[in-house]
């Protein structure tokens, strides 16, 4: 059970049987229920406990089971830490551009209802980048692209958008041994291509002529300059990039440090705006009825099995081994650093002895010599 005086997700869900009341009023996917209830039990003593022993100094420790769900603020942060290390390990040592591809709020309810279309957004981003490079004379260059689907904004509203990490340049298709630098990303082409290809692919995926008249035509009419794309942020090294993107992408829906008020009926939290206006970075406080707050948190859980992160071009999994060897030869990738970061990433998940630092093992597996 959560501590009575702290404002945590667990406390809000447990308090006054809010969660039981919530599921009693709605039809909810069983996988979503399982994730939420795992989060509510995460780290509880004494029900969810495993005993460990250090094989070196025989120190005994009890550790609570962890749920490892995305919704959990503790496990979500642990995943974020591990993912930041993984990003630093896998990214090539070249300058990347951090881009954000958005869609108008009028399409959000449609994308919320048809969650199988989320993959369409991810695939379309890479298609846009390919066509943009072709338009600007870089069609013989293969970039590295990692796309991350993000279903919500900092205000917890459903706001589907895609973060893309794009190498500023790529390898030539013919030889695959020469790196070509590219620093110019034309906003006008990006925005219009993103609008056109996304709406086209949306209609193709739904196979519904109604989509053309209710979504496609109004969007072309209203957004004549295309959909908004932010592509101004350059990131210079892999370590900075890993931390930079995790801050926006891989974290839990809301950090508990942002929960600043709860009285049993209402929840207050804050966020900082991120846009191109003069209000960028401004703190905004939001107060919601507790059931509405729970509904927002639950609605952000992705469908079971959906891959939020996808790799394209030089980062695609079927080219990964070959490209790494080429990038090593060009001094854009370091095998020694990869080994070091692999070891560091393993530490995130290991249970280490508080006395000697040795990896602990489950007590039932211990055989004293």
What are the language-model segments listed below?
Residues 1-369:
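Beta->alpha loop/short-helix hinge microenvironment recognizer with preference
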């Amino acid at each position: 059970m959560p501590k009575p005086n702290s404002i945590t997700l667990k406390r809000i869900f447990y308090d006054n049987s809010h969660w039981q009341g919530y599921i009693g009023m709605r039809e909810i996917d069983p996988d979503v229920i399982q994730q939420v209830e795992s989060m509510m039990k995460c780290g509880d003593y004494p029900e969810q406990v495993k005993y460990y022993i250090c094989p070196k100094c025989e120190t005994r420790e009890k550790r609570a089971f962890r749920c490892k769900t995305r919704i959990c603020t503790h496990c979500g942060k642990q995943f974020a830490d591990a993912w930041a290390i993984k990003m630093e390990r896998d990214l090539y040592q070249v300058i990347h551009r951090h881009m954000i591809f958005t869609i108008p709020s009028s399409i959000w309810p449609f994308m919320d209802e048809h969650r199988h279309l989320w993959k369409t957004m991810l695939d379309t981003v890479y298609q846009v980048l390919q066509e943009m490079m072709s338009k600007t004379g870089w069609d013989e260059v293969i970039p590295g692209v990692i796309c991350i689907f993000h279903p919500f904004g900092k205000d917890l509203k459903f706001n589907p958008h895609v973060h893309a990490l794009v190498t500023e340049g790529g390898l030539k298709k013919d030889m695959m041994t020469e790196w070509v630098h590219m620093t110019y990303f034309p906003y006008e082409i990006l925005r219009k291509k993103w609008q056109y290809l996304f709406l086209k692919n949306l209609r193709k995926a739904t196979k519904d002529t109604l989509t053309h008249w209710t979504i496609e035509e109004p969007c072309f009419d209203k957004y004549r300059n295309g959909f908004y794309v932010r592509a101004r942020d350059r990131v210079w090294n892999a370590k900075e990039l890993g931390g930079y993107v995790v801050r926006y992408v891989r974290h839990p829906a809301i950090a508990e440090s942002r929960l600043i008020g709860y009285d049993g009926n209402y929840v207050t939290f804050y966020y900082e705006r991120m846009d191109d206006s003069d209000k960028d970075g401004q703190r905004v406080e939001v107060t919601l009825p507790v059931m509405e707050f729970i509904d927002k948190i639950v609605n952000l859980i992705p469908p079971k099995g959906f891959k939020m992160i996808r790799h394209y071009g030089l980062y695609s999994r079927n080219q990964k081994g070959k490209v790494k060897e080429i990038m090593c030869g060009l001094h854009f990738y370091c095998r020694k650093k990869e080994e070091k970061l692999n070891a560091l990433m393993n530490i995130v998940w290991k249970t280490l002895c508080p006395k000697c630092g040795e990896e602990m093992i489950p007590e039932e597996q211990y055989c004293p010599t």
